[in-house]
Amino acid sequence: MDKNEALRTFTTGENFHLQHYLGAHQDEVDGKSGYSFRVWAPNAQSVHLIGDFTNWYEEQIPMVRNEAGVWEVFTELPKEGDIYKYNIKRSSGQEILKIDPLAIYLEERPGTGAVIRTISEKKWKDGLWLARRKRWGFFSRPVNIYEVHAGSWKRNEDGSPYSFAQLKEDLIPYLVEMNYTHVEFMPLMAHPLGLSWGYQLMGYFAFEHTYGTPEEFQDFVEECHLNNIGVIVDWVPGHFTINDDALAYYDGTPTFEYQDHDRAHNYGWGALNFDLGKNQVQSFLISSIKFWIDFYHLDGIRVDAVSNMLYLDYDSGPWQPNKDGGNRNYEGYYFLQRLNTVIKLAHPDVMMIAEESSSETKITGMRELGGLGFDYKWNMGWMNDILRFYEEDPIYRKYDFNLVTFSFMYAFSENFLLPFSHDEVVHGKKSLMHKMWGDRYNQFAGLRNLLTYQICHPGKKLLFMGSEFGQFLEWKSEEQLEWSNLDDQMNKKMQGFTAALNAFYKDNRPLWEIDLSYDGIEIIDADNTDQSVLSFIRKTEKGDMLVCVFNMAPVERKNFTIGVPVEAIYEEVWNTELEEWGGVWKEHNETVQSQEGLWKDYPQTLTFTLPALGASIWKIKRRIARKNVKKDSTKE
């Protein structure tokens, strides 16, 4: 794309490779080698390029404005490694130094200058992974995500976070050992505070230097792919940091943010909202995420705070209704549709995941039918209900059993992902293990039950770091996980349990092959509120099945009976109360032959002992006969 076409498509919102036009680029003009700099500041009175190569303010280089508000200059002065900024003169006459919004490298904190560095093209070795990803997709594949804050998974002795070179050596073997299919990172784009979570960004193309270099992250992703692990990154297209030296009021007027003051300001988060209806902002944001997908070979993007982009009144501050008198943010809705259209045309095999907390419908609906076109939506309703239930004293659970069963009413209204994320283990909410009811033994039993329920429930899975071994204290972003917990045998066994559970999930197609329709699940009994027991079947297209039974009460139930559709010998393949995982059972239930007898609509019954606060999963070891099979429950 030549310069004129790049400028035209930028102004029409159709330039999705903006990093090749704006920013700093090696160039040659009239036989002279140097760098061309371009920045969008349409209402600036003047823009000067300053940096190491100008002795900063001493020899500022004036830039020239074109008709679209892009300022440009070519100079031979810069060299590799030099730091630069733009000195922007506003209409008020005030001058302010600003970052380059398209910078791929930023200097180390506390500075915010862009660094001139040549981007070397990596010779990737993950071709087989990418080919498999394209061929297999992800809807009918196992997706079990380990959510990580890169700055606090592990830290060095001096308290500094691990770089991605170190995470490559430590985290990837851990992911393999724990049998996860994907790892998801909280934002890795440049943000003002190194100890923050990263959700108020300043550099949408720049890698957060706290975690090393872009090249180190490329190597990390490649090594993940070579170990059959996908990589997902959080991205924040709705709002950005209010810091003066970043994008805020870039040229002295609303540039990236909305013109209206209240729409521009996100009062609850102390941030600014992108003007998602502005063509140039659309080019900027979509180029950002395409760059991350292409440059780092990412397998998925989790779009943060989607509700904030869909509703004008989502924030706590004042707001104005739309042209129809409602609270729908039409610009945000159309932007998200367009975002997913562009990404899916280029990368149909890259997951687009919405973190969306409202009751808005069609988040994962087809764009052609008015949906937003995401592949998955976080099921926040399921997460809130299920955590409330597992925190409750079992005495009262029979009165709130609908908290467990209600999700089956809407489980396929969207393509759901079931999250136990970082948001649930901070700010006084307690860790996942600490949320569980009872003494220490029962808390671990409850956590084993909970994680098994998550694995068996339709939908893809996500678990925040530390929860896999039952960390007791809340997550603290400025400290590493409590790895010392693993000196305690209960935590060590919990870690082993999670690794085995993740392997069990990957190895059993009924748990993931049909995650998007009722064809993949059959409820046996959701009405046993008095005993707080839930049972259902997960199935494959070929009719293979797992019988999943959950006892949410601390009472062992001997001679417990449920109905099953097939006459067969059944074997227990999962029991959360085995000694090796911190329970009291020395071994599995013995194999059981089903018995003829009508149980609800089922022609056969299965009787066994159900562990206290335990989950028991059964599969057919050998079919005996195919008589009186419940219609549609299995296929020939």
UniProtKB/Swiss-Prot annotation:
- NCBIfam families named in the record: branching_enzym, PRK05402.1, PRK12313.1
From the Swiss-Prot or TrEMBL record, give the protein name: 1,4-alpha-glucan branching enzyme GlgB
Any one of the GO BP annotations: glycogen biosynthetic process
Keywords from UniProt, A to Z, are: Carbohydrate metabolism, Glycogen biosynthesis, Glycogen metabolism, Glycosyltransferase, Transferase
Report the Pfam families cross-referenced here.
Alpha-amylase (PF00128), Alpha-amylase_C (PF02806), CBM_48 (PF02922)
For this protein, the record's HAMAP family field holds: GlgB
How this chain assembles, per its entry, is: Monomer.
User: What are the annotated disulfide bridges?
Assistant: none
Give the record's pathway: Glycan biosynthesis; glycogen biosynthesis
| Record-annotated active site | 304 (nucleophile), 355 (proton donor)
- Lineage, top-rank taxon, reads Bacteria
Q: Which GO terms describe its molecular function?
A: 1,4-alpha-glucan branching enzyme activity; cation binding; hydrolase activity, hydrolyzing O-glycosyl compounds
- EC no. given is 2.4.1.18
- What organism, scientifically named, is this protein from? Streptococcus sanguinis (strain SK36)
UniProt lists the family membership as follows: Belongs to the glycosyl hydrolase 13 family. GlgB subfamily.
Q: Where does the UniProt annotation place the signal sequence?
A: none
What would be one Gene Ontology cellular-component term for the protein? cytosol
What is this protein's function per UniProt?
Answer: Catalyzes the formation of the alpha-1,6-glucosidic linkages in glycogen by scission of a 1,4-alpha-linked oligosaccharide from growing alpha-1,4-glucan chains and the subsequent attachment of the oligosaccharide to the alpha-1,6 position.
So what does this thing catalyse? Transfers a segment of a (1->4)-alpha-D-glucan chain to a primary hydroxy group in a similar glucan chain
